[in-house]
Amino acid sequence: MTLPAARTGVLARKVGMTRIFAADGRHVPVTVLSLDGCQVVGVRSEEERSVTTKKGGQVTRTDGYKAVIMGSGDKKAKNTTKALRGQFAKAGVAPKAKLKEFRVSGDLPEVGSTVQADHFAEGQLVDVSAMSIGKGFAGAMKRWNFSGLRASHGVSISHRAHGSTGMNQDPGRVFKNKKMAGHLGDERVTTQNLVVVRTDVERGLILVKGSVPGHDGTFVEVRDAVKKALPADAPAAGSFKAPEKLSAGGEG
């Protein structure tokens, strides 16, 4: 059995939630994701290449794997480090606010090209990853959905307490990862198998059914679903727009 080539994911900005109406009149809750000028900033390849050292010598190196570095969002050049400015200039793209590397196994796109919204086919399933909304210190009922204790019949003060956490004299300790009160949110979360309801190539929008992690305005990673096969009408190698070289004053 030959597995299909792993395609690159994309970086998108979460705009917010709304709803659209299907052909039969049903309303579908969707999250709007904006590609926000998502471009290929660099690539990693298994091919050997010649690199010039600081002393002027030549050495042969390889990355050892295939990957695509995607960048999204605008960022002022004065707020970008000198090292990153050099990478963006080499790629011929404006400074990006967010970078992410995606492992691939197929053909590598051209550096500087822009990904289009039809990189994903309508009806296919995708996985969306992002940092969840931080909610600070939370109790066991909010954090782990505990039912809590009774409202009366001898219960006093401990209505929302998580109850006993220890065991007997053996082992005589609280196990690690015990569900207790603590910090909630602000962690990497992946929502799997979300349906792509609609794409808008002109405006660079992807509409997925349901909610995705993170607050409005955060960057999310969108990939082909790892647990579901791609549909037959999915783009073979993604849809990319040819790169446009920056002018001399394009980095301001």
Curated annotation (Swiss-Prot):
UniProt entry keywords in alphabetical sequence: Methylation, Ribonucleoprotein, Ribosomal protein, RNA-binding, rRNA-binding
Cited InterPro entries:
Ribosomal_uL3 (IPR000597), Ribosomal_uL3_bac/org-type (IPR019927), Ribosomal_uL3_CS (IPR019926), Transl_B-barrel_sf (IPR009000)
Protein's UniProt keywords contain rRNA-binding: yes
Claim: Isomerase is one of the keywords in the record:
no
Which PROSITE patterns does the entry link to?
RIBOSOMAL_L3
Mark the residues carrying the PTM N5-methylglutamine: Q169
Gene Ontology CC: one annotated term: cytosolic large ribosomal subunit
Post-translational events: Methylated by PrmB.
Q: Which GO terms describe its molecular function?
A: rRNA binding; structural constituent of ribosome
> Subunit structure of this entry?
Part of the 50S ribosomal subunit. Forms a cluster with proteins L14 and L19.
User: What's the stated role of this polypeptide?
Assistant: One of the primary rRNA binding proteins, it binds directly near the 3'-end of the 23S rRNA, where it nucleates assembly of the 50S subunit.
**Similarity-based family:** Belongs to the universal ribosomal protein uL3 family.
Name of the molecule in the record: Large ribosomal subunit protein uL3
Q: Which organism is it from?
A: Hyphomonas neptunium (strain ATCC 15444)
Question: Gene name on record?
Answer: rplC
